[in-house]
Curated annotation (Swiss-Prot):
InterPro entries: NHR-like_dom_sf, Nuc_recep-AF1, Nucl_hrmn_rcpt_lig-bd, Nuclear_hormone_rcpt_NR2, Nuclear_hrmn_rcpt, Retinoid-X_rcpt/HNF4, Znf_hrmn_rcpt, Znf_NHR/GATA. It is found in: Nucleus; Cytoplasm. A zinc finger (NR C4-type) spans 139-159, 175-199. Residues 1-138 are annotated as: Modulating. Residues 205-230 are annotated as: Hinge. Composed of three domains: a modulating N-terminal domain, a DNA-binding domain and a C-terminal ligand-binding domain. This is Retinoic acid receptor RXR-gamma. GO terms for biological process: cell differentiation; nervous system development; positive regulation of transcription by RNA polymerase II; retinoic acid receptor signaling pathway. It comes from Bos taurus (Bovine).
Length: 463
């Protein structure tokens, strides 16, 4: 029927042959599909039959069909016996026939099969796994926006939490329908059984949840061990012993006041600080690990913090004094006397920011000792040979103080933070005191570095 049409085809001069050659040229359908070039022989379709699988393999997938520069024509009466392909620029017009049609696509539904495995899950509405959807990170379970890859699958926080709870609590669900419930963003909470099954089908791993729990437990145990080792390495009992060893007995002072001295308040404070500077070195030697530092670093730390350390001591000693401070010599310095001497502003700061706060929270000796140890171990002091070691010691004191407050004052969860808030005020007041030259006459003509070196080299006196 189509013999005359399909047997011979005339091409323009020079196409597929030698230059200047004209005449009839025929081509094999299979050759045309495989090479796109005309053949020199003139067989009929019956000479070289082409099977249906070969023709479909030439077409391949819809992407191949759309990407090909040729138009493939097949017969709808049965398996096509051949196909004609036209090179670019040449139009082939099929003879009028209702029995010919153009195959331009392949049904996608025939190529994609439902996921094998669990019964009823094949009918669920699975999100697309095309490259575009992966870029958007859609939850593979319900289609909501993904927050990342959880337990091996891109999923939202809701599905992640649902799967984790199911595994950790070893929950068992049942489906009220046919185990094929639709799981999407709006209906993901309707059936927990089908949601959990879909989590498994999409690739969520039970062992990933168990490993995460094990890692969390190991991390918590490690942190607890570090904290315990810090407490053992910097025991609060030794810090308290250091405080008690150098603090004078205040009960022997009685009701002594500034009237017992003819000196002005500034001179009295300087004399008291002079006396306390000797005991300050003894106190530092009793703090755990301070003596393990190099002698040069010990001098640097004491030189950087001695004013704050002394101010903290007499501030805490003065919590029982009304409107004044109690010096280590047993003398009281009243607010009015300080104002008369021209140092009223800094004196007021000591009373309001330190003495009053210590009194309100009833700061004990152990807490005072820890705060002073934190001041002593200052990793920012200039000239330290090993600031990281000093920082490690300070962190140990932090851990010791926090553990102590939690154990001693469990009803005050914010006590540790309140204690640390006194440190900035102490630092600011200490700098202001240096500006007022309070302590510049402490040791006469002896340079403070020389004095500290001599004191630190003196063996610790044990009682």
């Amino acid at each position: 029927m189509y013999g005359n049409y399909s047997h011979f085809m005339k091409f323009p001069t020079g196409f597929g042959g030698s230059p200047g050659h004209t005449g009839s040229t025929s081509m094999s359908p299979s050759a045309a599909l495989s090479t796109g070039k005309p053949m020199d022989s003139h067989p009929s379709y019956t000479d070289t039959p082409v099977s249906a699988p070969r023709t479909l393999s030439a077409v391949g997938t819809p992407l191949n069909a759309l990407g090909s520069p040729y138009r493939v024509i097949t017969s709808a009466m049965g398996p096509p016996s051949g196909a004609l392909a036209a090179p670019p620029g040449i139009n082939l017009v099929a003879p009028p026939s209702s029995q010919l049609n153009v195959v331009n696509s392949v049904s996608i539904s025939e190529d994609i099969k439902p996921l094998p495995g669990l019964p009823g899950i094949g009918n669920m509405n699975y999100p697309s796994t095309s490259p575009g959807s992966l870029v958007k990170h859609i939850c593979a379970i319900c289609g909501d926006r993904s927050s990342g890859k959880h337990y091996g699958v891109y999923s939202c926080e809701g599905c992640k939490g649902f799967f984790k709870r199911t595994i950790r609590k070893d929950l068992i669900y049942t489906c009220r329908d046919n185990k094929d419930c639709l799981i999407d963003k709006r209906q993901r909470n309707r059936c927990q059984y089908c949601r959990y099954q879909k989590c498994l089908v999409m690739g969520m791993k039970r062992e990933a949840v168990q490993e995460e729990r094990q890692r969390s437990r190991e991390r918590a145990e490690s942190e607890a061990e570090c904290a315990n080792s810090g407490h053992e390495d910097m025991p609060v009992e030794r810090i308290l012993e250091a405080e008690l060893a150098v603090e004078p007995k205040t009960e022997s002072y009685g009701d002594m006041n500034t009237e017992n001295s003819t000196n002005d308040p500034v001179t009295n404070i300087c004399h008291a600080a002079d006396k306390q500077l000797f005991t300050l070195v003894e106190w530092a030697k009793r703090i755990p690990h301070f003596s393990d530092l190099t002698l040069e670093d010990q001098v640097i730390l004491l030189r950087a913090g001695w004013n704050e350390l002394l101010i903290a001591s007499f501030s805490h000693r003065s919590v029982s004094v009304q409107d004044g401070i109690l010096l280590a010599t047993g003398l009281h310095v009243h607010r009015s006397s300080a104002h008369s001497a021209g140092v009223g502003s800094i004196f007021d700061r000591v009373l309001t920011e330190l003495v009053s706060k210590m009194k309100d929270m009833q700061m004990d000796k152990s807490e005072l000792g820890c705060l002073r140890a934190i001041v002593l171990f200052n990793p920012d002091a200039k000239g330290l040979s090993n600031p990281s070691e000093v920082e490690t010691l300070r962190e140990k004191v932090y851990a010791t103080l926090e553990a102590y407050t939690k154990q001693k004052y469990p009803e005050q969860p914010g006590r540790f933070a309140k204690l640390l808030l006194r440190l900035p005020a102490l630092r600011s007041i200490g700098l202001k005191c240096l500006e007022h030259l309070f302590f510049f006459k402490l040791i006469g003509d002896t340079p403070i570095d020389t004095f500290l070196m001599e004191m630190l080299e003196t063996p610790l006196q044990t009682t």
